Amino acid sequence: MDAFVAGYGTGGTLAGVGRAVKQRYPLAMVIAMEPAEAALLCGEMPCCHSIEGVTGGFIPPLLRSAPLDDEVKVRSADALAMTRRLHRDFGLLVGTSSGANVFAALAVASKLGPDPTVVTILCDRAERYFSTRLFGAGTLPSQG
């Protein structure tokens, strides 16, 4: 494993999985995914973004002890587009935080050279978002 990439809400998943990754794969990187519009770990101010369940406007205490090596920013629009791609092309009915994680993992993989192993987590499901813009006009398979 070369890297683990995930967003954070409470910080529990990123901190806990990050510690386990470092124990098993000491050279692997643990990378936090943050909305580009609210990249708190990068020193930016909290702001509105559309990646539900991620970055609640503060850096949670659990994350302060996480073995983080880097951060990657994902724009809300890129998270939404990746989420829709996961629905359409792979049949994975996930929410935007999962789309953001996949987008970030692919970005990290592209920087690591040939054939990296980058792991992420699909941490939500789409049923929570049926009434949001995630399922707006033009997103259903029958509509193109």
Can you describe what each PLM-predicted range is?
Residues 7-18, 97-105, 129:
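Short glycine/serine/threonine-rich phosphate/pyrophosphate-binding segments
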Residues 57, 106-144:
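Phosphate-binding loop/pocket of nucleotide- and phosphate-handling active sites
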Residues 18-25, 109:
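Surface-exposed amphipathic alpha-helices with a cationic face
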Residues 4-6, 92-93:
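Short glycine-rich phosphate-binding loop at a beta-alpha junction
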Residues 22-96, 133-144:
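Active-site/ligand-binding loops adjacent to catalytic centers
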Residues 15-18, 51, 80, 84, ...:
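Predominant activation on well-ordered alpha-helical scaffold segments within soluble catalytic domains
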Residues 7-9, 32-34, 119-123:
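Short beta-strand segments
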